[in-house]
């Protein structure tokens, strides 16, 4: 399965509008770049050929097919390790990982990977929320990761003590990338598959459900996902724009979740709620 990148130039003033236009795209696959002193905005969307071709047809721009070398950009300088609540560290190169005093709590994701490295507000907040709850989870707890992307949340769940993790994504490209990352991190408890977030009948019930999905898909898939959440389990969600968080929280509460605790970072929101 090949990865493609759609690119378009715009202005910084249009950033919010572009977030809304691209609301149906996994937020981990959307990168918006600005430069100091410039009012320009560069938009990148990573995905399959059909997705990027549709964007090109609807909005112009250009589409490029990415080689594996470009996708992971292994020539990029490694960044400093990212610490998550002092319980996880995300490394960008094997040399840095080798020096970690707690390798069992360390995650390797290559520097320059196109998406899903833990830098995006949606992923970073999910990781923090997961770190916060895991000390109090029952022994042998399990997780379901909906919209896994690069697999970072599933890998984090195993590193934090999950006995089993099921992770899926609708995009086969994401599953290919996540399989490579799971292998690189020597994870043995993660089962990956291509699946639709609105058709989750095959998955087992879990103590934690992670859903890094755009708001419309999150609302549509929540009834099925919550059926997979055990009583007293935790639902962690992200990928929601600040302008849409009230609607998402209302939908989740109508399905029986407690009022979510919401964390806002810039334009993005994440939340956590418990199932009674």
Residue ranges and their predicted role:
Residues 113, 117-197, 201-202:
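Conserved SAM/SAH cofactor-binding pocket of Class I
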Residues 8, 45, 116, 168, ...:
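Active-site-adjacent beta-strand anchor residues
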Residues 105, 140-141, 233:
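Nucleotide donor/acceptor-binding cores
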Residues 41, 58, 156, 160, ...:
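Alpha-helical structural signal in soluble globular domains
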Residues 74-137:
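SAM-dependent Rossmann-like transferase core, predominantly class I methyltransferases
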Residues 132, 136, 170-276:
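S-adenosylmethionine
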Residues 2-100:
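N-terminal auxiliary segments of SAM/dcSAM-dependent transferases
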Residues 61-62, 86, 103, 163, ...:
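A short helix-to-beta-strand connector/capping loop
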